[in-house]
């Protein structure tokens, strides 16, 4: 058994414990948590660290199969142009895709991730996940704006789900976004997802989504025409609210990803769904659109916030801590305890893993991370703040 202490322990079950003690078995299961009142009376067989002990991170939005695309697409070009270059650059050899994914998986684990919702369009990362130390929830993503190809698109992703099932991997079928799926494909997908426990969807990532849905115009529409993805006017949901409340399954939790241009009216309307989580991937938002989601608005509307990294096509690292640093630098009023809760407990709840992850309490196996080089007086992250895995 191992026993750890630090300046503070954020258990997510109550107030931070000053110089508390957490004990764990060799397999990482928490066996005890002690509130010392800030006074350590014994130091024998105890590892004391200068920093904050927190549960392992939960990444609620990742694209591991795009790990080979690091530095291929220039930053700050907008989503429409990003997608155009993405379609051209995604193709790569199987060996490169798998080796890049394996490297990214190892780095993500070192950076503290214990549970991850990963978007899959193919089976490319399945071999990596069967040997990973990270628990993955595979969100098998379907997209297709051409209604004539709707049945084919659904059948393709169902073939991916068959392989995931045969390997014993956790999976759900999910839509890509409101703007990339025809009404017909939404309808077909809805019939297949009535028992989903977890669904996710890219949401309000760019202003161009609204112009496409409402007027069939703008940069995304131009991109579809240029890429010959559709012939004529697309048949889409009328707006983002209709996508959430009418087109997407009401079953289980729904994670809305990015929310870069979310507005108060839309937030209030879609929050009526219930079981809704708002995933922030700020570094990807800055990389693609050079714009951040309205974090203060989401907080003010009592949205349950979770954290994701997106992909190495739109980010330099798959590090949850780096995402938290970015949020803290632009929104310094957000408390460190809230940031940690978003990146741990909220994510665990969103992914249905709160029985094991997200809190430091007996019987759970959340992983233990040491958050170092922070401003302990102000409880703020610094550019040099970093994570060390204890378990």
Regions inferred by a protein language model and the residue ranges of each:
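Alpha-helical scaffold segments that flank or form the walls of functional sites
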Residues: 23, 52-53, 68-133, 155-166
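Active-site gating loops and adjacent loop-to-helix segments of metal-dependent hydrolytic enzymes
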Residues: 68-99, 137-143, 207-251, 274
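His/Asp/Glu-enriched, well-ordered alpha-helical/loop segment
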Residues: 221, 227, 247-250, 281-284, ...
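Glycine-enriched alpha-helix->loop->beta-strand junction motifs that scaffold or abut catalytic
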Residues: 132-136, 192-198, 249-254, 269-279, ...
């Amino acid at each position: 058994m191992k026993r750890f202490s630090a300046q503070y322990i954020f258990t997510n079950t109550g107030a931070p414990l000053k110089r508390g003690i957490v004990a764990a078995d060799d397999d990482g299961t928490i066996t005890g948590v002690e509130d010392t009142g800030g006074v350590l009376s014994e130091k024998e067989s105890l590892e004391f660290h200068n920093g904050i002990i927190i549960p392992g991170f939960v990444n609620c939005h990742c694209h591991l199969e795009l790990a080979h695309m690091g530095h291929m697409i220039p930053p700050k070009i907008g989503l429409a142009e990003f997608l155009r270059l993405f379609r051209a650059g995604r193709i790569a050899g199987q060996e490169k895709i798998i080796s890049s994914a394996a490297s990214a998986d190892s780095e993500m684990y070192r950076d503290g991730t214990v549970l991850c919702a990963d978007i899959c369009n193919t089976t490319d990362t399945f071999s990596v996940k069967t040997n990973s130390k990270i628990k993955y929830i595979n969100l098998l993503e379907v997209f297709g704006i051409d209604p004539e190809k709707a049945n084919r698109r659904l059948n393709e992703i169902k073939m991916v789900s068959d392989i995931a099932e045969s390997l014993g991997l956790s999976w759900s079928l999910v839509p890509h976004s409101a703007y990339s799926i025809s009404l017909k494909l939404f309808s077909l997908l809805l019939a297949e997802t009535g028992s989903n426990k977890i669904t996710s969807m890219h949401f309000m990532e760019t202003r161009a989504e609204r112009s496409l849905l409402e007027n069939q115009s703008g940069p995304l529409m131009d991109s579809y025409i240029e890429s010959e993805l559709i012939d004529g006017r697309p048949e889409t949901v009328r707006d983002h609210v209709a996508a959430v409340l009418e087109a997407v399954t009401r079953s289980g939790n729904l994670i809305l990803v990015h929310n870069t241009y979310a507005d108060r009216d839309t937030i209030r309307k879609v929050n009526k769904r219930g079981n809704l989580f708002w995933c922030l991937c700020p570094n990807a938002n800055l990389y693609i659109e050079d714009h951040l989601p309205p974090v203060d608005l989401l907080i003010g509307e009592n949205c349950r916030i979770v954290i994701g990294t997106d992909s190495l096509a739109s980010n330099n690292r798959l590090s949850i801590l780096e995402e938290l640093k970015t949020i803290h630098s632009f929104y310094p009023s957000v408390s460190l305890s809230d940031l940690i809760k978003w990146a741990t407990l909220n994510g665990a709840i969103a992914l249905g893993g709160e029985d094991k992850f997200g809190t430091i309490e007996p019987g759970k196996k959340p992983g233990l991370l040491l958050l170092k080089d922070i401003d302990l007086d102000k409880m703020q992250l610094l550019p040099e703040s970093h994570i060390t895995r204890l378990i």
